């Protein structure tokens, strides 16, 4: 089997920021990395779930709403993926994400936290979501990272896979 592209990122050197994870078939997947993998705690599931609801709501109502395909959490709980059509640079996504995080910090409730609207409506934590949002906002404004550190992987057959 081929190595999945996201597994070629050196997670021991990955910093919070915004990265282009992949570009294919007219879609761009952005990696909104909130915490430093394997060095900081992952975002708590309830806070991440609230962040998902809030970010999805904001992005789908933003100036970029017609280009938003998907907003959702990474399985490792260290960030969010945003999939877009259109031509957005990392700086465009940084600006949009900063605006989104500022909006989240002003919210008093998480949208769609009813049993008919959410599959796990009790798993939410707005205060912790806002704490994570404030920390990520500060990082995007003062310590921004957008270039992946690549990892070389030797496959079972001895070939070297490096996604450059």
Tell where the protein language model's regions lie, with residue ranges.
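Active/ligand-binding-proximal structured segments within catalytic/core domains
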Residues: 27-60, 70-71
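Active-site-adjacent, His/Asp/Glu-enriched structural segments that form or flank metal-binding
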Residues: 73-145
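Short coil/turn segments at secondary-structure boundaries
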Residues: 42-50, 68, 81-88, 92
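A domain-level signal for the structural core that forms small-molecule/cofactor-binding pockets
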Residues: 58, 115-118, 142, 155, ...
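Conserved alpha/beta core surface patches that mediate binding of polyanionic ligands
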Residues: 12-16, 56-65
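A broad, structural surface signal
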Residues: 53-61, 95-102
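Non-catalytic terminal extensions that flank enzyme cores
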Residues: 1-38, 153-154, 160-164
């Amino acid at each position: 089997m081929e190595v999945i592209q996201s597994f070629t990122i050196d997670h021991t050197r990955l910093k919070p920021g915004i990265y282009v994870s992949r570009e294919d078939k007219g879609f761009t997947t952005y990696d909104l990395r909130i915490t430093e993998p394997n060095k900081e705690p992952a975002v708590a599931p309830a806070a991440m779930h609230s962040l998902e609801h809030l970010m999805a709501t904001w992005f789908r109502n933003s100036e970029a709403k017609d280009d938003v395909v998907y907003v959702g959490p990474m399985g490792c709980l260290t960030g969010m993926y945003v999939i877009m059509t259109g031509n957005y640079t990392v700086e465009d996504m940084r600006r949009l994400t900063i605006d989104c995080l500022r909006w989240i910090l002003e919210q008093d409730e998480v949208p769609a936290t009813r049993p008919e609207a959410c599959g796990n409506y009790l798993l939410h934590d707005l205060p912790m979501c806002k704490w994570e949002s404030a920390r990520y906002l500060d990082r995007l404004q003062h310590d921004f990272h957008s270039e992946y550190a690549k990892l070389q992987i030797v496959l079972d057959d001895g070939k070297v896979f490096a996604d450059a």
